């Protein structure tokens, strides 16, 4: 498994992701700095969470213009897998790798808590091939701008073509705040047209130890890696 984690000034979840990937694969992933203009052939690149460039202008806006983005787009064109988590998802949208927008949470407050994700009837994707529609994962979120919005046409295209990976799930009829940010259609993550790029707001790397709240993130990352290299 040839994996790498892309790191920007202000990234703060890169270490957690590196620990998670090493726990699964047995070796540390390569670290790609935002100024790197060359990268080896890789199976997977992960853009982790954090506050790249201090979230100036917009979350992910400056990072999306870093030299490494060209390499990341070349990686995608070669068929490589790409995962963007939280700020990584924001960067993918700002770089026009994934569609839509991520704006301030509906309550205009930072949110940090556990959420339940429901796997959707998605197109063939290595990130979801080992899961069934309706499977649930408990994975935490921590963000201020995770409210996914898109126009009606794009939302329909995402729904009709199986490009919605996860939705926040309501666990009971009396639960009213299951959607932590107000995302349209309860969207928590979306896929590229070929299913090999996934952007998601929840943090799987923060759910890899039963002593720290659960292991659903480890389950998700493990199955994703197995499919990517399989």
What are these regions (language model features)?
Residues 88-89, 123:
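Short, flexible active-site-adjacent loop segments at beta-strand->alpha-helix junctions, enriched
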Residues 1-85, 92-99, 103-110, 118, ...:
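N-terminal beta1-alpha1 cap of cysteine-dependent amidohydrolase-like domains
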